[in-house]
Swiss-Prot record:
Keyword Lipid metabolism found: yes
GO cellular component, as recorded: membrane
Gene name as annotated: arnD
Classification lineage: Bacteria, Pseudomonadati, Pseudomonadota, Gammaproteobacteria, Enterobacterales
Domain of life: Bacteria
EC number, as in UniProt: 3.5.1.n3
Domain NodB homology span(s) in chain numbering: 2-260
Name of the protein described by the UniProt record: Probable 4-deoxy-4-formamido-L-arabinose-phosphoundecaprenol deformylase ArnD
One Pfam match: Polysacc_deac_1
Amino acid sequence: MTKVGLRIDVDTLRGTREGVPRLLATLHRHGVQASFFFSVGPDNMGRHLWRLIRPRFLWKMLRSNAASLYGWDILLAGTAWPGKNIGNANAGIIRETATYHETGLHAWDHHAWQTHSGHWSIRQLEEDIARGITALEAIIGKPVTCSAAAGWRADGRVVRAKEPFNLRYNSDCRGTTLFRPLLMPGQTGTPQIPVTLPTWDEVIGPAVQAQSFNTWIISRMLQDKGTPVYTIHAEVEGIVHQPLFEDLLVRARDAGITFCPLGELLPTSPESLPLGQIVRGHIPGREGWLGCQQAASAS
């Protein structure tokens, strides 16, 4: 039996309102639990449209057929009008999710984090994280114990900024296996659970066709030599590709794969995890930098 952590990112108002309820129903039908990470502040995701001038981002949008994949309400959110507050508008849905699934913070403002966090000060990072955690805790009525940086935009600064919040774990980077981030000699931070597998939008195109994606990703899960962690998005697998996600759950079960919340991947003694660090890097299929796992001894 192969255990795979299932992470569900919720980036937008529509993803929360439409995608999450469908995912909750789908997961319930198959007896699967996952980790949901919510954006709880303004939905300004449409402001990413200016990035179309960048060839890699434009190619990604064309390759994934973004207009039909996400919908124009997502692609234009927060452009000609102020972005609506996701948490306030969908508090009931978020509370229901937290009743049945591990629930953590994705971002206060997903667009702002993905666009600006790379040059924010530690204080600005801490203030933004605090705003998101405070809002999410007010909605679910209990402490937030985990987080996942929006767009995997994380580095050593983000690791340090999250330390005051005493979270059980963070999932801020791409990598191969769980690790303890080294803050300074002799001091380690909150355990990191990296995402190890590609997302739908990173690979769909000439190399992998939509109809063969489930077979392809299951093969990758079974071949993963580390601690497999897979990310889906409420805006994709919860809406237009919900039938394909349901098919994935069936195929994965038949292949001997069990999905679980990320928190279940943590060992009883986190001190046993290897040391590592998060550095800025790039991966195929994703425009811009993102946090990548690196051995602690690497320079």
